[in-house]
Amino acid sequence: MKLDRRLVIKILEEKIKSEGIVLGSDILKVNSFLNHQIDPFLMSQIGQAFAEKFSHENISKVLTIESSGIAPALMTSLQLQVPMIFARKHQSRTLNEEFFSASVYSYTKQTENQIAVSKRFINPGDRVLIIDDFLANGQAVQGLLDIINQAGASAVGVGIVIEKRFQAGHQLILSKNLPLVSLASIDRFEDGQVVFSKQGETSHVN
C-alpha cells in the first residue's frame, strides 16, 4: 500500500509542535523522538517516505553522520534494500584502515569535527543518497558531499527530516543542483513556538 506522505508530514509536525523545545532564535530540541529517544514507528514511516520519493534514483548506498541521522537513514536503507553507512565523528581505534575524511563545523555545539568513512564502503560508481535529521547551515551535508566526491561516487539526493528554512543550508544544496526533500520545513521560531513553512514539505526532485 502506498504511503500517504502528507499524513507522515502532519504527524511529524505535530510531534515537533507538541514535544519540540525551542532554544533561543535558531535551535530546536527534539530529544523525545529523534535526537535521544527514538520513535521507531515514526522513523519507519519517514524512511518509507524518503525511499518512495527517491525510488527512481537507482541508489546503491545511504549515507549519514553519527549519531542522530542513523535512525532515519537506517529506515530509508531498509526500504531501499541497500547498505547504510554512517560517517564517524571521532576516529575509533578499530578504524585503522584507510578512510575518506572531511571537516564539519557544528553551529549548535560550536565545535569542528573530522568525520570519516572507510574507503572499503564507498566506491567509484556508487549512487549515494544522503539522509540527515536536521538541515541548518548545511555543513554536515557539505562534509558528506566531500567524502562522496573523494570516493569518486555520485550524490543523487538529500533527504532531511527537519529543515530550518531560514538558515543557509537550503540554498547551499540547491546551488549544487541536488534533489532535496525536507519533510518538515520550518520558516521561523516565534515567541518560543515553531512556525512551519506555508509551502509544507520542501521537495526539489528531478
From Swiss-Prot:
Pathway: Purine metabolism; XMP biosynthesis via salvage pathway; XMP from xanthine: step 1/1. Its main location: cytoplasm. It comes from the Bacteria. The keyword Cytoplasm applies. Gene3D superfamilies: 3.40.50.2020. Transmembrane segments: none annotated. SUPFAM superfamilies: PRTase-like. GO terms for biological process: purine ribonucleoside salvage; xanthine metabolic process; XMP salvage. Keywords: Cytoplasm, Glycosyltransferase, Purine salvage, Transferase. One of its GO terms (molecular function) is xanthine phosphoribosyltransferase activity. Belongs to the purine/pyrimidine phosphoribosyltransferase family. Xpt subfamily. This is Xanthine phosphoribosyltransferase. It comes from Oenococcus oeni (strain ATCC BAA-331 / PSU-1).
